[in-house]
Amino acid sequence: MNASATVAGVDLPDGQPARVLHARPEPLRMKPGETALVVVDMQNAYASLGGYLDLAGFDVSSTGPVIVNINKACAAARAAGIPVIFFQNGWDPAYVEAGGPGSPNWHKSNALKTMRKRPELEGQLLAKGGWDYQLVDELKPQPGDIVVPKIRYSGFFNSSFDSVLRSRGIRNLVFTGIATNVCVESTLRDGFHLEYFGVVLADATHQAGPDFAQQAALFNIETFFGWISSVDDFCTTFSPVGQPS
């Protein structure tokens, strides 16, 4: 790690030592107290056979290793005192929150389009309270974790996310989840414009679409909006001193 590390966040002199996370395009100095692990939309809709993405024709057959890696990152974050924040994407059962024909979301959401093509699915996809909306069984929040509902691709839109972060002094966001090229990237981009430092753990994310969508999203993030790292590097960086993961 020869490159000098970028200082993430405000790096307050509070006696808490900063850690250096191996990342691209350069290492990042981060403090656990200024950092949150963000788990994006790990719901049946996005990660399970029979969920919305699967029914809409997207391949979800390789989400299993992503779930395993997210669990590993969550365990490391909790052990380091880093807040774990789960996003849960969806709308009220009447889909008022989804917007009507006057909203671009009504026209572009593949969940809404799939239900219009298949009326028998109406009320099932991404509806709060339903199986599709639920987080996958393997990634249930633990005591102390935070769950933030959201209604659009970006977790900052019309949600409590920014308030949750600012009230805790969080400046650094470490992203995992689905989909890299949609909700992960959208939230990281919005965070960039709100002065948050965004890192994606590439092996704890999965795209909606072909593999080139994953690679394009990671390229955009590394080049323009944030940093790319891995679950192993995250776990090693934030393991208790003298106790490598």
Curated annotation (Swiss-Prot):
CDD domains: cysteine_hydrolases (cd00431). The keyword Hydrolase applies. It comes from the Bacteria. It holds the Pfam family Isochorismatase. It catalyses: (Z)-3-ureidoacrylate + H2O + H(+) = (Z)-3-aminoacrylate + NH4(+) + CO2; (Z)-3-ureidoacrylate + H2O = (Z)-3-aminoacrylate + carbamate + H(+); (Z)-2-methylureidoacrylate + H2O + H(+) = (Z)-2-methylaminoacrylate + NH4(+) + CO2. InterPro entries: Isochorismatase-like_dom, Isochorismatase-like_hydrls, Isochorismatase-like_sf, RutB. Its EC number is 3.5.1.110. Gene3D superfamilies: Isochorismatase-like. The active site is at D41, K150, C183. One of its GO terms (biological process) is nitrogen utilization. The keyword Transmembrane does not apply. GO terms for molecular function: hydrolase activity, acting on carbon-nitrogen (but not peptide) bonds, in linear amides. Keywords: Hydrolase. Hydrolyzes ureidoacrylate to form aminoacrylate and carbamate. The carbamate hydrolyzes spontaneously, thereby releasing one of the nitrogen atoms of the pyrimidine ring as ammonia and one of its carbon atoms as CO2. NCBIfam families: RutB (TIGR03614). Belongs to the isochorismatase family. RutB subfamily. This is Ureidoacrylate amidohydrolase RutB. It comes from Pseudomonas savastanoi pv. phaseolicola (strain 1448A / Race 6). The lineage of its organism: Bacteria, Pseudomonadati, Pseudomonadota, Gammaproteobacteria, Pseudomonadales. The gene is rutB.
